[in-house]
Amino acid sequence: YVSPAHMTKWGDIMPVSRRLELVNYSAAHGSLVIEDDFENEFVYLQKPTPSLFGLAGGQNVVYLGTFSRLLLPSIRISFMVLPPELSALYRKKADQYNQTASKAEQIALCQFIRDGHLAAQTRKLKRLYSVKLKALRSAVREVFGKDSQIQTGAAGTSLALTLSTNLTWQELQKKAQTNGLRLQLLREAPGKITLILSCSSMPVADFVPACKLLKDISQIQN
């Protein structure tokens, strides 16, 4: 199981060379790769990389995708592309599968895609998140300084920020909640806490104030 467009929470992408290694290994050993192509639509800093499914010619790879990042998450429609031999097996047992997505939503989504609206939505969100992620990086640099420890990748809507603080994660989280900040922990080490900061739902105008608030509470001594 791999998510090549989301190797880390801050958007690292699996290079083509590594993808080819996996494809060749699965072909040589008859193994099956499950490819979850989450956030493959949001690649900004390099050209889009071919999927494992495409590189393998549809053999030995199951491709998983979702529309949750492009459309309303409440629609809850995902999809799976199977290699030919598994596709034939699935068709034989399809009546045992419990479909939870309504037919009306599936038909509407199909028409939405046919009419080109999904492609337009993808381009729109890609531009939006590219601008917002750049603004978030700038806000972090402005507030925490040019030497702040930031990790970013070529894709996604998040970055990792390492804070130097005497607080524990539980203490920082409690202070953040008291001040209206919701934080996501990546890792904790003595004197350091690494957080995942997302640009997706917060307005750009709030990036600098939120970073200033985070800096203030992380420097509070208990």
Enumerate the predicted regions with their spans.
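Conserved core segment of the aminotransferase class I/II
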Residues: G57-R127
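Active-site phosphate-binding strand-loop segment of PLP-dependent enzymes
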Residues: Y1-Y44
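Inter-domain helical "communication" segments and dimerization helices
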Residues: S17, E21, K92, Q96, ...
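Helix C-cap/helix->beta junction micro-motif
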Residues: A28-H29, Q59, N179, Q221
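Residue-level detector of anion-binding/catalytic polar loops
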Residues: L32, L181-R182
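Conserved PLP-binding active-site segment of the aspartate aminotransferase-like
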Residues: L82, A160-T165, R182-I217
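Conserved glycine-rich beta-strand-loop-beta hairpin in the small C-terminal domain of fold type I
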Residues: C110, R127-R137, S148-T162, W169, ...
